[in-house]
Amino acid sequence: MVYISNGQVLDSRSQSPWRLSFITDFFWGIAEFVVLFFRTLLQQDVKKRRGYGSSSDSRYDDGRGPPGNPPRRRMGRINHLQGPNPPPMAGGUGR
């Protein structure tokens, strides 16, 4: 990256990419990634054991708040016995 120092345009590539501060920053970045990765795995496991997030009424013990899960809509084939018949398809014979 180009920058200006004392009125002169300098290129930061003149510094060594393997300087000590880069190596230590890289090491601590990897260490923090590993720690956060395993911490999030363990937090997910604790939440599942305690029942967090699986029950919608666990936070509302006094009766206020949203009701339980609404009934699910059934997905499946179209019921042809309800409603009027569709109109005939338009089109010619091709002549």
Swiss-Prot record:
The record marks 82-83 as: Cleavage. It is found in: Endoplasmic reticulum membrane; Cell membrane. Disulfide bonds: none annotated. Cleaved by CAPN2/m-calpain in resting macrophages but not in activated macrophages. Macrophage activation up-regulates expression of the calpain inhibitor CAST/calpastatin, resulting in inhibition of CAPN2 activity. It holds the Pfam family SelK_SelG. GO terms for biological process: calcium ion transport; endoplasmic reticulum calcium ion homeostasis; protein palmitoylation. The chain crosses the membrane at residues 20-42. Its main location: endoplasmic reticulum. InterPro entries: Se_SelK/SelG (IPR024491). One of its GO terms (cellular component) is endoplasmic reticulum membrane. Keywords: Calcium, Calcium transport, Cell membrane, Endoplasmic reticulum, Ion transport, Membrane, Selenocysteine, Transmembrane, Transmembrane helix, Transport, Ubl conjugation. The keyword Transport applies. The keyword Transmembrane helix applies. Residues 47-95 are annotated as: Disordered. It is a single-pass membrane protein. Required for Ca(2+) flux in immune cells and plays a role in T-cell proliferation and in T-cell and neutrophil migration. Involved in endoplasmic reticulum-associated degradation (ERAD) of soluble glycosylated proteins. Required for palmitoylation and cell surface expression of CD36 and involved in macrophage uptake of low-density lipoprotein and in foam cell formation. Together with ZDHHC6, required for palmitoylation of ITPR1 in immune cells, leading to regulate ITPR1 stability and function. Plays a role in protection of cells from ER stress-induced apoptosis. Interacts with DERL1, DERL2, DERL3 and SELENOS. The SELENOK-SELENOS complex interacts with VCP. Interacts with ZDHHC6. PANTHER family: SELENOPROTEIN K (PTHR16875:SF0). Belongs to the selenoprotein K family. This is Selenoprotein K. It comes from Bos taurus. The gene is SELENOK.
